Every structure is written in structure tokens, then in C-alpha cells.
Curated annotation (Swiss-Prot):
G-protein coupled receptor activity is regulated by lipids: oleamide increases HTR2A-mediated activity. Inhibited by IHCH-7179 small molecule: IHCH-7179 acts both as an agonist activator for HTR1A and as an antagonist inhibitor for HTR2A. SUPFAM superfamilies: Family A G protein-coupled receptor-like (SSF81321). Its main location: membrane. Gene3D superfamilies: Rhodopsin 7-helix transmembrane proteins. The keyword Glycoprotein applies. A motif (PDZ-binding) lies at residues 469-471. Keywords: Behavior, Cell membrane, Cell projection, Cytoplasmic vesicle, Disulfide bond, G-protein coupled receptor, Glycoprotein, Host cell receptor for virus entry, Host-virus interaction, Membrane, Phosphoprotein, Receptor, Synapse, Transducer, Transmembrane, Transmembrane helix. Serotonin binds at D155, N343. The chain crosses the membrane at residues 81-97, 112-137, 147-171, 192-215, 233-258, 323-348, 357-382. Changing S280A: Increased ability of hallucinogens to desensitize the receptor. A motif (DRY motif) lies at residues 172-174. The gene is HTR2A. This is 5-hydroxytryptamine receptor 2A.
Length: 471
């Protein structure tokens, strides 16, 4: 842009396109005395810089000039950024719906993923469109200056919330592997929501200094007309607190979780191979279902038993979940690391580095980081069957899973042992009463028959007696 404004040869090369676009040449009609501008006037306007000393690069930064000189480039950029925005919003809305409606997905880890989807969705709604607008305006801030600090605050807030959620998920999974009894006993829906609130509170606290100081001093959020963090202290401290420290915790806990799962799987396989019998903890009450679930992961019983098979299955499920989360962690790190590393380099080698190159890299890397918010729903779709089936139904506007007729047949063919003993006793009493009533009716009918036969025989005997007496 600066080259086009400063070099006369570059400006004269654009006259061919100006001669072909009569409608666009009217943009310069205000600079001439005549009502309509012709091609020679346009040529003189671009070349005769001596007679027009007030012409500068600032005049070339108007929206009409930008749309004329960079029409093709800006349209491609707008198209790519619009695709990222649509994928981010639509995909994360599907994740929120899936966790809210599917009972299979309602657990602590998926609640964290739903909150992460909310952060990514808000990033697509509030931050990405404004960033796309700045691209169209040549990375100049086109909105009121007070909104610049608010926009940077939202950008840092949602990006920090994303990595804080991933860090919290990694810690939660590690605690669940290391201490399953304590984790299962104290891990409820309420506790999960409290952890999510804590994550959002930390994210707000980290990003709050930006609007506090940025609204008071515009120089902290403006640099040469562009809306960005211009304070080196903000850049350094914010990068380490909001990204590098949580990243270190997330990576360490994730690898410790993988190591613990491998160790547990090795122990379980060795127990199955050697058929070693360990303590059975038979003193536990059979009616305590929660206690049984708590010890399924930490107790290995006789090989071939139901508990041993289920322990191995639980380890396999944990490994699959860690695989999916590992892919999410890896993509987030790969997509955001270039931006934060370049951001730190811009502060450290401020004098020796080329600011134009650093600025261009930051503009590209920030959108690669935004792309991670759109990738997460795709990962869930590829590696989780429940998410995949839920997304396909939601796209078809089917928000409830269709029940198969076989399920109704199974409900109607429940064996008698599935009922409670009290229900069986009541049924037996009812049947015994009906049998007794039937027996009484039968007995009464027999009695009536006997009575009728006795009366008939009595009548006959009376008749005989009467006849005898008469004789």
C-alpha cells in the first residue's frame, strides 16, 4: 500500500484499470473543478504530484481507495475469514447442544468441553468479525477508539479461557487416575460447575487490566492507527500468565496421566496372565453401588471374573478419552504457539527485528490460533461416536434419539425376578385371594347341589312314608 502511494511508476500502472472502470473514476471527481472526471484527469491526479502537494498516503487509506486497489486480495481474505467464523460458531453450537441434550455426554469432562465450546463460540461472535473488519480496512481501526480496548479484552479473555479449560481438564483427568476413590466421591455436577466458574474467574482476572488501563490511555492499545497491545509489559506478562504457564501444566499432567494409564494397564494384564488372586474386599455391603464403582479401578479380583473384565474395560475407555483430549491439546498448542512466540520475539528483539515482518506474521498467526476454535468440534465428530450421531441428528432437526421398537419389546418381556419382592408378595396374595374366592364359590355350588339332592331324596322319602301310612 505504501509502495503504491509513494512510487509514481506503481501509480501510473494502475491507470489502465482506472480507464476501464468509468464508475470508479467518479470517486476522484471531488478533486476537480469539472462535474465529471475523465481518464486524463485521473492520470494527472495520480502522476502530477508537484501540483498536488497535499496528496499523501493518508488519502490512499480511504475505504474506496482500498477497495479499488486491493479488491481481489481483500475479497479472498474476507472469504477465508468468513469460512472460519461460520465453522467456529456452528460447530461449537452443536457441541453445546450435544452436551445439553445427550445424557451419555453429561459428565465432568464434557461439561468442561461445553464451557470451552461457549468460549470458542463467543470468540467467533464477538472477536473474529471485528478482526475481519480490520483486515478489510488495511489493519486500521475503523470503530470508535473506546471499543479498541474492549475488543482486545474480549480477545484475550476468550483465548485465555480456552487454554485454562484445557489445563483444568488435564488436571481433572490426572486426579481421576491417581485417586479414583476421592475423585468419584467428590466429583458431582455441582463440583464440575464450580470448577468451571473458577476457570472463568481466573481468565477474567488475567485479562481485566487491559480495559482498565486501555480506556484511560489510548497509547497502550493503539500503535500507528492499529488496535493492538502496545505496552511491552502487557505483552510479556500476559503471554506467560495466560499461555506458557498453563501450557506447561497441561503438558506435564497429560504425560503423567498417560504414564499412569500404561502402568495400570500393565498391572491388569499381568494379573490376568498369572491368575493371581488379590484381596476381594468382601466386607463391602452389596447394596452400596457407589462403593462398588469406586473400587472397580483400584482392585483386581480373580481373572475371568466380572470385576476384572470391567476394570480392563475402564482402562481402555480412559485411554480412548485421553487420545481424543490429546489431539485437542496438540492442535491447540500447535496453532497458538507461533503467535505467542512471535509476540515475545517482537518485544525482545524490538530494535533488531523488522517490525513490518513481525507485524505481518502476527496478523497471520492470530488467525491460525482462531482456527483452533473451529477445529475442536471436528475432532469430536471424528473420534467420538456419540458426538457424531448427535451432530448428524441436529443437522436434520432431530433433537431426540428415535427409540427402536426392540426396546419396547424388551420392556414388555421383563422376567418376574426383575420385580421387587414386595410386588411379588402382593401379587401372590392377590392370586391366593382369587383362588380362595373361586374355591368358596365352588364349595357353595357343591353344597347347593348336595342340599338340592338331599331335599329331593327327603321329598321322595316323605312321599313313600305318606303312601305307607295311607296303606
Amino acid at each position: 500500500m505504501d509502495i503504491l502511494c509513494e512510487e509514481n511508476t506503481s501509480l501510473s500502472s494502475t491507470t489502465n484499470s482506472l480507464m476501464q472502470l468509468n464508475d470508479d473514476t467518479r470517486l476522484y471527481s471531488n478533486d476537480f473543478n469539472s462535474g465529471e472526471a475523465n481518464t486524463s484527469d485521473a492520470f494527472n491526479w495520480t502522476v502530477d504530484s508537484e501540483n498536488r502537494t497535499n496528496l499523501s498516503c493518508e488519502g490512499c487509506l480511504s475505504p474506496s481507495c482500498l477497495s479499488l486497489l486491493h479488491l481481489q486480495e481483500k475479497n479472498w481474505s474476507a472469504l477465508l475469514t468468513a469460512v472460519v467464523i461460520i465453522l467456529t460458531i456452528a460447530g461449537n453450537i452443536l457441541v453445546i447442544m450435544a452436551v445439553s441434550l445427550e445424557k451419555k455426554l453429561q459428565n465432568a469432562t464434557n461439561y468442561f468441553l461445553m464451557s470451552l465450546a461457549i468460549a470458542d463460540m463467543l470468540l467467533g461472535f464477538l472477536v473474529m468479525p471485528v478482526s475481519m473488519l480490520t483486515i478489510l480496512y488495511g489493519y486500521r481501526w475503523p470503530l470508535p477508539s473506546k471499543l479498541c480496548a474492549v475488543w482486545i479484552y474480549l480477545d484475550v479473555l476468550f483465548s485465555t479461557a480456552s487454554i485454562m479449560h484445557l489445563c483444568a481438564i488435564s488436571l481433572d483427568r490426572y486426579v481421576a487416575i491417581q485417586n479414583p476413590i476421592h475423585h468419584s466421591r467428590f466429583n458431582s455436577r455441582t463440583k464440575a460447575f464450580l470448577k468451571i466458574i473458577a476457570v472463568w474467574t481466573i481468565s477474567v482476572g488475567i485479562s481485566m487490566p487491559i480495559p482498565v488501563f486501555g480506556l484511560q490511555d489510548d497509547s497502550k492499545v493503539f500503535k500507528e492507527g492499529s488496535c493492538l497491545l502496545a505496552d511491552d509489559n502487557f505483552v510479556l506478562i500476559g503471554s506467560f500468565v495466560s499461555f506458557f504457564i498453563p501450557l506447561t501444566i497441561m503438558v506435564i499432567t497429560y504425560f503423567l496421566t498417560i504414564k499412569s494409564l500404561q502402568k495400570e494397564a500393565t498391572l491388569c494384564v499381568s494379573d490376568l496372565g498369572t491368575r493371581a488372586k488379590l484381596a476381594s474386599f468382601s466386607f463391602l455391603p452389596q447394596s452400596s453401588l457407589s462403593s462398588e464403582k469406586l473400587f472397580q479401578r483400584s482392585i483386581h479380583r480373580e481373572p475371568g471374573s466380572y470385576t476384572g473384565r470391567r476394570t480392563m474395560q475402564s482402562i481402555s475407555n480412559e485411554q480412548k478419552a485421553c487420545k481424543v483430549l490429546g489431539i485437542v491439546f496438540f492442535l491447540f498448542v500447535v496453532m497458538w504457539c507461533p503467535f505467542f512466540i512471535t509476540n515475545i520475539m517482537a518485544v525482545i528483539c524490538k530494535e533488531s527485528c523488522n517490525e513490518d515482518v513481525i507485524g505481518a506474521l502476527l496478523n497471520v498467526f492470530v488467525w491460525i490460533g482462531y482456527l483452533s476454535s473451529a477445529v475442536n468440534p471436528l475432532v469430536y465428530t471424528l473420534f467420538n461416536k456419540t458426538y457424531r450421531s448427535a451432530f448428524s441428528r441436529y443437522i436434520q432437526c432431530q433433537y431426540k434419539e428415535n427409540k427402536k421398537p426392540l426396546q419396547l419389546i424388551l420392556v414388555n418381556t421383563i422376567p418376574a425376578l426383575a420385580y421387587k419382592s414386595s410386588q411379588l408378595q402382593m401379587g401372590q396374595k392377590k392370586n391366593s385371594k382369587q383362588d380362595a374366592k373361586t374355591t368358596d364359590n365352588d364349595c357353595s355350588m357343591v353344597a347347593l347341589g348336595k342340599q338340592h339332592s338331599e331335599e329331593a331324596s327327603k321329598d321322595n322319602s316323605d312321599g313313600v312314608n305318606e303312601k305307607v301310612s295311607c296303606v
